[in-house]
Each structure stands twice: as structure tokens, then as C-alpha cells.
Amino acid sequence: MGMLKEFKEFAVKGNVVDMAVGIIIGVAFGKIVSSFVSDVIMPPLGLLIGGVDFSDLAITLQHAGEGVAEVTLRYGVFLQAIFDFIIIAFAIFIAVKAINTLKKKEEAAPPPAPPEPSSEEKLLAEIRDLLKQK
């Protein structure tokens, strides 16, 4: 039972839960970026280059034959993956920069002034001072 208890404590710690949420959001964000690159960015870019569909770009090393599969280097798909990575890296950079800016603002803010002592606290302080004098 000790190991189960330790696992429960580990699993419900804030860092583990935060990390799990971050991974789930990251996977979903990755799918969005992949779709954005392949469906929005690459078609106009291919059109500008001369009607090229990047996903079809490949170098055939061996043509298909009887019982032999075609061997190709699909460098167009690789280029799309590079665009995915660049966009995801840039988005993460912007997010981290924004978070760091917010943290600096929180650190730079002066701590709030202590509240003015209540009338009871002032009276108790006066009594304390009078007792010290005697």
C-alpha cells in the first residue's frame, strides 16, 4: 500500500498535472499548425514557385518492379515538417516571452504598504509603551 500512496501523491502534485495539460494542449496545437502549414501556407507558396505541390516532391531511388516496392526520398514532406517546426518554435518563443514579461511586471511592482493599524492596535501599543515606562 505504501507504493500506491506514494504514486497518488506524485500524480496529484501540481507540476505533474500542469505538465499533462501542457502536453495535451501542445499535441492539439501541433495538429493545428500542421494543418495551417499544409493547407494554408504551402499551397500559395507552391503556386508562387510554379504550381508545385510540396507533398509530391520526391526523388525516386528505385522504381517499382515485380515484387519490389518503389524507394523514394520524399523531401517535400520534410520541407513541410521544417515549416511546422519553425512556426511552432516561433509560437512557443512568443508565448514564453509574454509570460516572462508578465513575471517581470509582477516582480517590479512594489509590495503593497502594510495596512494602517486599527484603533484597537494603536490603543494596545500605547498601553504597552506605558507599561514599559513603569
Swiss-Prot record:
Compartments where found: Cell inner membrane
Keyword Ion transport tagged: yes
UniProt keyword annotations, A-Z: Cell inner membrane, Cell membrane, Ion channel, Ion transport, Membrane, Transmembrane, Transmembrane helix, Transport
Gene Ontology molecular functions: mechanosensitive monoatomic ion channel activity
Superkingdom of the organism of origin: Bacteria
Family membership noted in the UniProt record: Belongs to the MscL family.
UniProt KW Cell inner membrane keyword: yes
Subunit structure: Homopentamer.
Annotated InterPro entries: Mechanosensitive_channel_CS, MS_channel, MSC/AndL, MscL_channel
NCBIfam families: mscL, PRK00567.1-4
Membrane topology summary: Multi-pass membrane protein
Record's protein name: Large-conductance mechanosensitive channel
